[in-house]
């Protein structure tokens, strides 16, 4: 939407202030983000959740009562976050690749 100041600046041949340009671009980005997210309906999220659980359940036993799937938005990026507590692998034990991050997790699991 063009303000009176923008109209006068345009008629006088002045450039639009960078703040106004930045604001207009931000509004377009926000509108674009809202449109993209609106396509993720509850039914679609439920279907994705079920399919993810079906695939993971082929390899590990999941604690279905503790499963949490959510959408999280940060810095204009939306992520599907799935917290799937694993009881054990299908063959009976949980195996981890040893890394700094999993080192503590392995110690906690063995307790």
Swiss-Prot record:
Q: What does this protein do?
A: Prevents the cell division inhibition by proteins MinC and MinD at internal division sites while permitting inhibition at polar sites. This ensures cell division at the proper site by restricting the formation of a division septum at the midpoint of the long axis of the cell.
Q: Name one GO biological process term.
A: cell division
Superkingdom of this protein's organism: Bacteria
Protein species of origin: Prochlorococcus marinus (strain MIT 9301)
Query: What keywords are assigned to this protein?
Result: Cell cycle, Cell division
Would you identify the family this protein belongs to, as annotated? Belongs to the MinE family.
NCBIfam families listed in its UniProt record:
minE, PRK00296.1
The protein, known as: Cell division topological specificity factor
Q: Which Pfam families match?
A: MinE
